[in-house]
Every structure is written in structure tokens, then in C-alpha cells.
Amino acid sequence: MASQNPNKKKVLFVTSEIADLVKTGGLGDVSAALPRAMAHLHDVRVLIPGYPQVMNSENPIHIIGELGGHAALPPCKIGRMDMPDGLVIYVLICPELYARDGGPYGANNGRDWPDNHIRFARLGLAAADIAANLAQIHWCPDLVHAHDWPAGLAPAYMHWRGQRTPTLFTIHNLAYQGVTSLGSCPELGIPAHALQQEGMEFYGKMSFLKAGMAYSSHITTVSATYAQEITTPDFGCGLDGFLAAKTQQGLLSGIPNGIDESWDAATDPHLFAPFAIGDWEGKAINAAHVRELFGLKDSEGPLFAVVSRLVYQKGLDLTEAVSEYIVQNGGQIAIIGRGEPEEEQAMRELALRFPGQIGVRIGFNETDARRMFAGSDFLLMPSRYEPCGLSQMYAQRFGSLPVARNTGGLADTIENGVTGFLFNESTADSYREALSRAFKVFAFPELLNAMRCRAMAAPFNWCKAVEPYAELYEKLVAKALGKTHHK
């Protein structure tokens, strides 16, 4: 994937997940797709911890470097994994931190690992070490692009050391802040001057997310609307003033995510039947199979899908509140996802209330998700906030019209009344009004199919995101070198 083109910048992606190997949400999708989409412009390589899912993958790992310890952060090795398509992944090998059953952030019981501050400080320090050429891996980045709180200390360590390599920090979800006690400072080798309001201090504790924002050269988030929302108290999660100041300084911008080309109903091998724009027979076949999969009765009414993490942010309580309205009007709901135990139980109870009309599968696999997008008529996304969201783009690509709250990336990627249905207030009444519009459209097949056609044709590929990222990379590198950037 890398090229000898001297104009290409070398960029190190620092992330806690990548969809090829380990994924809990949209961060994993972006970490897999954006470096590949960027390949023709820059040499982007990915740094990720050596979780079991990474170490046990079918792709061989070759040890190429070693890094010493720092404070309580243990020494580690750097492995190189070459993906079949050429993407280079650097693996941070440290069994005492990462060789554990469970997910990237916690055990199978859902509890976070108590030493996450050590685990992800080690990731941030490794990125800083690679940027300083301490790993001696014969590749040194021109820019480090860190993602979300687990990578937040990468720009911080680089700043504290006086490293000149520019850094970009992307916020995928401001609510996850990587907060730990001030007493962790000595373990992490954090200088005392960092624990100030303009540094990583956060209401008497310290935040990895704030560190990434405070010490990076520039901050992005994953939609233009969300970039505006997080400067307000309603969405700022206690950081609105800090982010408003960054905006005023021209240091915060929104760049929307894209989706990869595999989301194509005409060619997707996971579907029960392929279909293209204007050909709805295949969609009907998928709908029948989805109903069977979820134990729903045969029906001529609309099929609504929920493909989501089952957490408070996603507004599942609102879907619960409008479920009777949907069923009474002839609709059915298929729900798939995993998340907080109380949300999972609420969805199970919802299915018991409406047997044959609402079906739930706790867990997640992408094959079922793709089939649900292909078979459903509408996707339900009543999120209280949504930094970008990918499901609404996947759904539109497969002809499923989103019924979604007018927030964040949903506002930027759904055209109300054209490719979906938006509602403003996080209330059941506002949600119900949008659903009534969806039911009315469903009653007129020509109108429904026209909206499906427009949704399936919406331009959600990564090309739209790559260009502003590439320009920002070039601008930050040029600034670090003391050059003037020209567009």
C-alpha cells in the first residue's frame, strides 16, 4: 500500500480498534476504512494494541522493534502485520496489558479493566516513541493522527517531550472521556504542569480525551453539526467552554465519515437476494427472511429495524414508548444489538409484549445487520446525540429510510422528507410525528420507492472525507516545517 512517491506524507493512525481485527463501534469502521481510502494520497499505517483478537488473527506478525518502559508503563515490542490489501498495521505487543479475554476496554462481564489508564497510556507513549524514531522500525511519521480517548496521550507525550511532529486528534464520541484520578500521574509519567485547566485536568481528575484535545495541533470530529453542538452545554459533556475556545482559535472542525464500497445491495454476498435501485423484488425477499429470522408474522405492513448499541444515548426508551403506536398501525420491529444489561432486558420485555410483531436478538454480527438493512423499510435512530452515525448511511444505501432525530451526523446525512424522516425533540410525541409521516409514505408505493431511489443514490463514499483530511494533513505538516500552506 505504501508508495515511494516523495510527496506522500507518512501518517501514523493511533487507535484502540480496527474492524478487520477488533471492533466495538464506528471507531473500528473508520480506522479500517480511512487509511485505505487515503492510500493513493499518503502512506497511512495503523498502531493498535495486541489484543488476543489481533495476535490470533490469520495474518502473521513479525517483531520489528522494541520500546523501553516509562514510569509504571512496561516495556513492549512492536510487531508488523501486513494485511492482504497492503495496509500496514503496527501491533503493540505487551501481554501483561493486552492478553486478556474480553473486549478492548473491559471483561466479558461488561466491567472496564481497572488498569485502562496504564493500558492506553502505553498506547499513547508507543505512538510518541515511534514518532521520535525510538522504535527504530525504519519508518517515522510526518504526522500522528490519534483517535478518541484511548489514544489521547499520544499528542500529550509528544508535546511534553518537545517533539515537533504535528498531531491531529479526532473525537468520535465526546461522552467517552477516559477519566482517571490525579493520583495516577506518577504511574503514567505525567508532568505536574499538565494538571491545569488548560491541560488535562478535568473537574478534579484527569481526562485522556481532554489531553488529546489540549495538546494536539488540531482537533476534528466526525460531522459538521456535531462540531457545533459540542461547543454548547447540552452536548459539551463539561467541555463546551474548552471546545468553544478551540473553535474560536480555528482549531476545531467537522469532517464527516464515509462508508466503504462493500455496502452495495447489488453485489453484497451476505444478502438473501441482491437488488438494485428500482428493483424491489430482492428487497422483498430479504424482508421475508428477516421476518423469519426474528420470529415475526408474515405481514404486508412496514418493517422497522433497530441496529444499534443498546445504550441510553441511542434513545431506545423512546422506541419502547412508541412501539405500541407502530404495532397498532400495522408495523413490525426487528431489533439487534448488545449493550447495557438494563437496555438489553428492556428490549427482551418489549418482544414479549408484542409476540410476532417485535423480535429481538441480543448480540451482534455484521451479516445479520446487513440483511436487516436490506430487508427493512425503515431504520429507527432516535439518538439523543449522534456524533456521526454509520447505520443511517448503511440503511440508505440498502433502501431503508431512516426515522431519526435531527442531531449531529444524522442531520448532516439525512435529507428530511427526501431520504428519510427527521424529528427535533427527544420526546415520544416528536418521534411519533415523524413515524406518522413514514407510515403515510409507506401507503403510497410510488412515493416510497422514489425516496428509496434517492436514498440508495446518496453519495456516502469515503472520497468526500478523504479530501478534507488530506488537505488538513498537508496543512499541519507544512505549518510544522514553517512553510505557508497553499490550497
Curated annotation (Swiss-Prot):
Listed name of the protein: Glycogen synthase
Organism annotation: Pseudomonas fluorescens (strain Pf0-1)
Family (UniProt): Belongs to the glycosyltransferase 1 family. Bacterial/plant glycogen synthase subfamily.
Enzyme class: transferase
Function: Synthesizes alpha-1,4-glucan chains using ADP-glucose.
Pathway where it operates: Glycan biosynthesis; glycogen biosynthesis
One Pfam family matching this protein: Glycos_transf_1
Origin superkingdom: Bacteria
UniProtKB keywords: Glycogen biosynthesis, Glycosyltransferase, Transferase
